[in-house]
Amino acid sequence: MARTQVLAALLTALIAAPLAGCASFTREDFTADQAYRAVPPTAADIRFDAADEAAALAFTNRTRRQLAANGDRRVDILAVSGGGADGAYGAGVMVGWTKAKTRPTFEVVTGVSTGALIAPFAFLGPHWDKTLADAYAGGKASQVLKGRGLGVVFSSSLYSPEHLRGLVETYCTPVMLHEIAQEHAKGRRLLIATTNLDSQQTVVWDMGAIASRGGPDSLKLFRDVLVASAAIPGVFPPVIIPIGDADGHKIDEMHVDGGVTAPFVSIPEGLYFWEAAEGPILRGRIFVLVNGKLDPSFAVVRGRAPTILGRSFDTMMKTTLRAHISANRAFAERNNMDFEIAEVPREAESNSLNFDPESMRRLFKLGEDNAVAGAAWKAPD
């Protein structure tokens, strides 16, 4: 389905929303102070706000110490961006990278939105490539955008979460969590970003720490975070994550697509201006896999609301992506780290909301071929 069709339906739903008279679910009111006090101390082991410099630095230092203790002298970071169906390109790049025999074993892998769905496979390595290819090029993603019909005016989203959650549950299994927990014990980290819509903060989740807790609650939270990170607001419903109690109130948080606040996360926002102290540090490389196109493209925009809305959204996302690329590149240069990006080629036909199986297979094959040929990665201009 084309982006303009989705946005046209979303615009119709927005116009009709005041007529609905009720929402799809209600929540109890609470204050920012209650939300803060409800978070249990143990939550610091599995999540932090990306803008919280102290929390981000504490997490970074713990990870560096454990990696150094395990003999790692270089830290390779892979950040996988959002991009919807264009994630097929990124999935293809990962598989092609394996075939080229140049794919690193990443110490840190992060994901946002569709990148959150790719990240666990990228983290676990080449023996999961076949499953990753099946997820993005096997046709299962084509049912993700399943409409609600007229019920959308009474709902929190345009599309049902049923197929998105089903996709996550199909591939995110206890076996996957067990392997992630094993790698976490070695000091490697798998991080997924969501947006806490109540606090307007990017929340970074340590998925290896969640997996290491074990049990059904761990599996549920792991899946909830993945679904939340991919839940484009208005397109898919938000994910409600219970947190704790404060003043006798049950406190929960509303989480949506991590791309609302960050198109990708290689360096948490709170560390953008941080510089490593003098002395021996671990060398590092940052790879940003962009499931989309960075460069502006010219088009005569027609005077229809969905077209204008779609073009504006696309422009905003590209501008935000380029700003984040610049900030992360500057961080890498200050801290003596290599920095490379991969993106969907300008000439490729792609659409982040086109989950047509043939289109996704073509995009996957393009990413795979480019990686095999050594043409996928480059230093930013």
Where are these regions (language model features)?
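Bacterial N-terminal signal peptides that target proteins for export
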Residues: 1-10
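C-terminal motif of bacterial Sec signal peptides marking the signal peptidase cleavage site
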Residues: 18-21
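Patatin-like phospholipase
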Residues: 23-107, 123-381
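Catalytic nucleophile serine of serine hydrolases
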Residues: 84, 112-113
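Hydrolases whose catalytic domains are alpha/beta-hydrolase-1, hotdog thioesterase
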Residues: 118-121
